Amino acid sequence: MSRKGHIKKRDVQPDPVYNSKLVTKIINIIMEDGKKGKAQTIFYQALKQVKTITNREPIKVFHEALNNIMPVLEVRTRRMGGQNYQVPSEVRPERRQSLGLRWIVKYTKESNEKTMEERLAKEIVDASLGNGVLVKKREETHRMAEANKAFAHYRW
């Protein structure tokens, strides 16, 4: 651990199209090998497809999707007395957001549609409607936390 105190959070610049820091964050997660232009193209094209699918404001659909998949509880492994316990704990708001964004990109890459834009648009629309793989992932995380409620007193 660092002895020089806490590290300051680096602030990201809002993206030029939607003026949103959240959009910049997901673009940075999509980005591979420093190709930010390509990541931006993928995300903006996906939002255009979301607009054609839902006939609604794409950034609002994206926010809805993110709110539907952000976990409130998670389990963390704690070693006590030679045993590992899955201890449920609340998720901080920043971590909630970053987990949601990472899950979107991870499951988009695993899906088997034709292009990344189509896959991303499909995942966003599904999550905004409250179904799909991402919502199941969140429910599974909550179920694990609920099942291990007995170990909640081991929290740190």
Swiss-Prot record:
Name of this chain's protein: Small ribosomal subunit protein uS7
Q: Which Gene3D superfamilies match?
A: Ribosomal protein S7 domain
For this protein, the record's InterPro entries field holds: Ribosomal_uS7, Ribosomal_uS7_bac/org-type, Ribosomal_uS7_CS, Ribosomal_uS7_dom, Ribosomal_uS7_dom_sf
Q: Which domain of life is it from?
A: Bacteria
Q: Name one GO cellular component term.
A: small ribosomal subunit
Mind telling me which HAMAP family this protein's record contains? Ribosomal_uS7_B
Q: What functional role does this protein have? A: One of the primary rRNA binding proteins, it binds directly to 16S rRNA where it nucleates assembly of the head domain of the 30S subunit. Is located at the subunit interface close to the decoding center, probably blocks exit of the E-site tRNA.
Which biological process terms from the Gene Ontology are attached to this UniProt entry? translation
Q: Which UniProt keywords apply?
A: Ribonucleoprotein, Ribosomal protein, RNA-binding, rRNA-binding, tRNA-binding
